[in-house]
Regions:
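Short hydrophobic/aromatic helix or loop-helix immediately within or flanking a transmembrane segment
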Residues: 51-86
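Helix-to-loop transition at the C-terminal end of transmembrane segments
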Residues: 32-49, 144-152
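Membrane-interface micro-motifs in multi-pass membrane enzymes
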Residues: 126-190
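Transmembrane-helix motifs of polytopic, lipid-linked glycan transferases
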Residues: 89-118, 184
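Membrane-interface alpha helices of multi-pass inner-membrane proteins
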Residues: 204-226
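Perimembrane helix-loop-helix junctions
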Residues: 1-5, 225-230
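Start-transfer (signal-anchor) and selected internal transmembrane alpha helices
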Residues: 1-34, 114-133
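Loop-to-helix entry region of an early transmembrane alpha helix in multi-pass inner-membrane enzymes
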Residues: 81-100, 129-132, 172-176
Length: 230
């Protein structure tokens, strides 16, 4: 009997669920604090958030952002809690969604290549916890790729905000907002490329196409990099 891939990605031991939810709560709380400080321009928390807040509030700023998803979403609550709080919370929610989506796809892929169902409950729990730790490690390490005192295009930018030269993407909310869609797009691209020559069906491209569209509408530069690779 063929397994449902959606259920395979969602099913998890209680120990695995508790570990993931605890780390997700902790991670999201820390990120929300960071985004809140950035949106309210607390000294020492430089970012592009002030320009994003102005966009949500309808105030003309120094830049135009022709990719609307993040700003549309933030405006849903801005009328009630203000543009600054709305942008901070919206960015945190997109960041949370990226972690949840990555965890789902990692679970699904692990179950494809391992005999998960044949493991004892203890080993299943250990597998779930290891996958969770791997997911959070990926999200943390993706922001720490630059060694200290490394120069890039002539800039010694370690631990400082230097606009597009900053190694830490937490300063850029549009990048964070596109990650949920980009992660879906990545895994669905792998699926389409692995199946299109032997069992291609147009309906299997739906999620790939939608995620690519949403990614482009959230951060077009992602598409400029990914589409040529495909």
């Amino acid at each position: 009997m063929k397994k449902n891939p959606i259920k395979s990605g969602l099913r998890e031991t209680m120990a695995g669920k508790v570990t993931f939810l605890f780390l997700l709560f902790l991670y999201t709380g820390v990120m929300l604090y960071l985004f809140w400080m950035e949106c309210y321009q607390v000294p020492g928390f430089q970012s592009d958030m002030p320009d994003y807040v102005n966009k949500v509030a309808g105030i003309a700023g120094n830049y135009e952002f022709p990719y609307p998803i993040l700003f549309w979403t933030a405006r849903l609550s801005a009328w009630l809690i203000g543009a600054k709080a709305a942008m901070a919370i919206t960015t945190a929610l997109f960041n949370l969604a990226a972690v949840v989506i990555t965890k789902y796809y990692m679970n699904r892929e692990i179950r494809k290549v391992s005999h998960y169902d044949d493991l004892t409950q203890g080993r299943q729990a250990m597998t779930d916890i290891l996958v969770t730790l791997l997911v959070f490690s990926l999200f943390l390490l993706s922001n720490l790729y630059s060694p200290k005192n490394t120069a890039f295009f002539g800039f010694d930018y370690a631990y400082r905000c230097m606009g597009i030269y900053t190694p830490n993407p937490f300063w850029n909310a549009t990048y964070l907002a596109t990650r949920p869609f980009a992660i879906i797009c990545f895994f669905e691209t792998v699926k389409v490329l692995s199946e299109y020559q032997r069992n291609f069906q147009w309906k299997n491209c739906t999620l790939f196409a939608v995620s690519l569209l949403l990614t482009t509408m959230t951060k077009p530069s992602f598409t400029m990099v990914v589409v040529p690779l495909i």
